Amino acid sequence: MSAEGPAPLARLVAELSRLPGIGQRTAQRLAFHILRAPGEEAAALSAAITEVKEKVGLCEECFNLSEGPRCRICADPNRDRTTICVVEEPADVIPIERTHEYRGLYHVLGGALSPIDGVDAEDLKIAELLRRVEGGDVSEVVLATNPTTTGEATALHIAERLRGQAAVTRLASGLPVGADLEHADEVTLGKAFAGRRSLD
């Protein structure tokens, strides 16, 4: 037994602290909570983690999270197929859906352009987006990348690549610069959608 406690506990703390936003102290609190929890609760947590890794993948059309080949949004015949909202990560779809302002389809890039981190256009799902726009009845592409330096660079790159193929709009102000979309509240995000602007 080390100063961190029994080896299995220390391993759990180490694994939990690898999660985003979880520091050493929070990892310790979570580990002790799991240790004190009934066996069924710990087993349910373990089963949920295993299940999500085994059953959740990416939609073959938009690259959002999905339990099958197509996500529920792409499979919904009531969605507006003339509009595609481009986001960086699957987590960004959730707050947009909560606004109930947007009824089109999505396209998840899988990140943002960041030359410093070695992420260029070929590392993202930009070519797939271009194919979707060229091969469909898309009249508007809403660029909802995060209002960060990398998000803005990504939006400008995509706008340039789509010039002349569809109307390209950007979410309006209301989203704080430097913030991530997944942390925006529904009202702010709804206003940003309602006031989106053209990038042509």
Regions found by a protein language model. Give the residues of each.
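Extended, structured, electrostatic nucleic-acid-contact surfaces
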Residues: 1-20
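Solvent-exposed alpha-helical segments within well-ordered globular domains of core cellular machineries
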Residues: 10-14, 28-32, 43, 47, ...
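Extended interfacial segments that mediate partner engagement and assembly in macromolecular machines
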Residues: 27, 75-145
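Short metal-coordination and nucleic-acid-contact micro-motifs, chiefly zinc-binding Cys/His arrays
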Residues: 52-55, 67
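Short cysteine-rich clusters marking metal-coordination/redox-active sites
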Residues: 59-62, 71-74
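Short functional micro-motifs and their immediate structural scaffolds
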Residues: 64-68, 79
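Long C-terminal interaction/binding lobes of large macromolecular proteins
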Residues: 102, 130-200
